[in-house]
Amino acid sequence: MVLWESPRQCSSWTLCEGFCWLLLLPVMLLIVARPVKLAAFPTSLSDCQTPTGWNCSGYDDRENDLFLCDTNTCKFDGECLRIGDTVTCVCQFKCNSDYVPVCGSNGESYQNECYLRQAACKQQSEILVVSEGSCATDAGSGSGDGVHEGSGETSQKETSTCDICQFGAECDEDAEDVWCVCNIDCSQTNFNPLCASDGKSYDNACQIKEASCQKQEKIEVMSLGRCQDNTTTTTKSEDGHYARTDFAENANKLEESAREHHIPCPEHYNGFCMHGKCEHSINMQEPSCRCDAGYTGQHCEKKDYSVLYVVPGPVRFQYVLIAAVIGTIQIAVICVVVLCITRKCPRSNRIHRQKQNTGHYSSDNTTRASTRLI
């Protein structure tokens, strides 16, 4: 006679307690491998200042390669980046090539306001825009020629008048009146016909710049090739001088400027630069690409990882590796525990029930056979 036994309860903790202990392993590893205090690295970039910039390569970086810049050490829109083995205050400004000169508070002239801000970032000193246009030069050395000697009012008037010479013109102080001199030589410039904004065709961009200087008005490149009316002009005067008479009118146009010798590429060059702007220069037969930040290469097809990303050092790489191992162990342990609970226990119950059912079935058959024999 087979005695009926109650089915054994699934002791999931007994089956999986070894795996559950593994869940404590990540916590133990994190406690043992806690980050070292940032004591070997400088707390500010002021300790890294050199005559040529900010360089922190002289500090011990073997223990930790993490560095945070504060607003007092990398100011004026600068960005602190780790490039190679150095931590430097980098001034990455995407300044265009437009010629809109400004005069800075340090007495220097800049191509446009963007270059002024870039210089302030590199020098880590404040540079303000004093006036539009190039900085004024001294009207005289003090010796005088009898005309302007001792006359501060006349000297100031002449200096302010010379300031309005724009578009590459220079002020000729030796002339009887104020003259703007255009010392632009286009004899060595290659032939590259262009259509300008004044509706005339020029042999190259240098002639457009020369015409803009002599007329003292803004003339831009509109398209490659000659204009539809094929009007060609050369604007070289005999003495290279241009007299300014409309001082008041042009004083309000100091923000206008002549562009550099780079012009946009024609439409059939669409897609020539993958991540940048296509430009055509008079000194090159083929167009060139001005890549966006983070890209390099002839067609801006390569990523500049040295700028966009910081290469982790050995200590940080060790932490990353430990974190990856911990994550893998956690996933494995969770999977094993889930499989243990959902499959191991129900399977044991099914096997036990099958054995019980088989025992009862055999007893019933034996009883029926004995009854028939009687």
UniProtKB/Swiss-Prot annotation:
O-glycosylated; contains chondroitin sulfate glycosaminoglycans. The keyword Manganese does not apply. The record marks 97-98, 188-189 as: Reactive bond. Residues 342-374 are cytoplasmic. Residues 303-320 are annotated as: Required for shedding. It is a single-pass type I membrane protein. Residues 40-320 are extracellular. Residues 90-137, 181-229 form the Kazal-like domain. CDD domains: KAZAL_FS (cd00104). One of its GO terms (cellular component) is membrane. InterPro entries: EGF-like_dom, Kazal_dom, Kazal_dom_sf. Residues 1-39 form the signal peptide. One of its GO terms (biological process) is negative regulation of integrin biosynthetic process. It holds the Pfam family Kazal_2. The keyword Kinase does not apply. Its main location: membrane. Residues 353-374 are annotated as: Disordered. Residues 261-301 form the EGF-like domain. It is found in: Membrane. Disulfide bonds join 91-121, 95-114, 103-135, 182-213, 186-206, 195-227, 265-278, 273-289, 291-300. Keywords: Disulfide bond, EGF-like domain, Glycoprotein, Membrane, Proteoglycan, Repeat, Signal, Transmembrane, Transmembrane helix. Belongs to the tomoregulin family. May be a survival factor for hippocampal and mesencephalic neurons. The shedded form may up-regulate cell proliferation. This is Tomoregulin-2. It comes from Bos taurus (Bovine).
